[in-house]
Amino acid sequence: MSAQRAERKEIVQRGLWFEEYEVGTAYLHRPGRTMTEADNVLFTTLTMNTQPLHLDAHWSSQQPGFGGKRLVNSMWTLSTVVGLSVSQLTLGTIVANLGFTEVSFPKPMFHGDTLYAETKCVSKRVSASRPGQGIVQLEHIGRNQNGDVVCRAVRATLVQCDPAASGDGSLDDGAA
């Protein structure tokens, strides 16, 4: 049996190397994540965000515009959208999160809504100052179960190049 094990091919789960990102490609992250009341209250209290629209059911029931429901914390929504992308894109291959731009929340999330995420590779370039690494710009989109966009953010990441690649910069696609 050990001889069979030695001969089998093994693949370790990981994100994408810099070279594997395709500019313009949309990566769909499944399954989605149903947002629960417990998730929202825990995240909201852990981050010291005491807004009653997240925590106070009675107060929220008296506010116009949301049907008396409490809103899911938008930072939880953003964190979950990024989190849903990790196993497919950046697991073990990201060096650093360089920053977010263009963050928006066009529609609210409520307890019981399911969040689905997708990520588009906007651009990529080999790092001029960090050999063996590249900068990948990603656009994350979160949608609820009805397909409504509830979160959008553009993120710059520093990603490892494939250790087996040449590393001479010839993989730069010129975008960015």
Give the predicted meaning of each segment:
Residues S2-L98, A164-A176:
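Hot-dog-fold acyl-thioester-processing enzymes
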Residues M1-V23, F105, M109-T114, E118-A176:
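HotDog/MaoC-like acyl-thioester-processing domains
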